[in-house]
Amino acid sequence: LMLSSGYLFADDIPVIVISPGKTVQSLGTVGSSVDVFTSETINESSHFSLAHIIDDNSTSTNLFQMGGYGSNIGIQLRGLEKRYSTVYVDGVKMLDPSSSDGSFYLENIMKNGVDRVEILKGTHSSLYGSNAIGGAINIFTKKGREGNHSNWEIESGSRNTKNILYSADGANDKYNYYVGLN
């Protein structure tokens, strides 16, 4: 009886949709290598930074940090330099004008404002521009829920690291908001 109930739960697993072709598709119909993280995976991680969460949960990614804790963090996809990977947040391409190659560092994106991450590995330059030879990282931020909500979290870790997170969100017929502070 326990085995048959497990099979029933397999039918209840929601289908995750992704957007590698800039249109919504089922994960099973995508022809390229894709990793998708939901807010549950992101929130359960012990890391503060989204870059470390991506590195822990995705294959073919290399995280490199230029200095000690809190310094610039870049991600390489499929072994190519970071300049060959593009980062989008809610469909907007992220570029760092202070970077020598225009790439974007992920150290300042904290996990509490992220709803979903899609990592599209492989050549996607026809859809995401010439810098997407290694792949593209699509980050989708959280949206406000109906009503008004707030949340506090306190985290601590090794090397005397501490993190305090606050978020507030809400929505009604006219607007929707989400604010996250670290």
Model segments located where?
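N-terminal periplasmic "start-of-domain" segments of outer-membrane beta-barrel proteins
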Residues: 13-45, 74
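Repeated loop/turn-to-beta-strand initiation elements of outer-membrane beta-barrel proteins
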Residues: 174-177
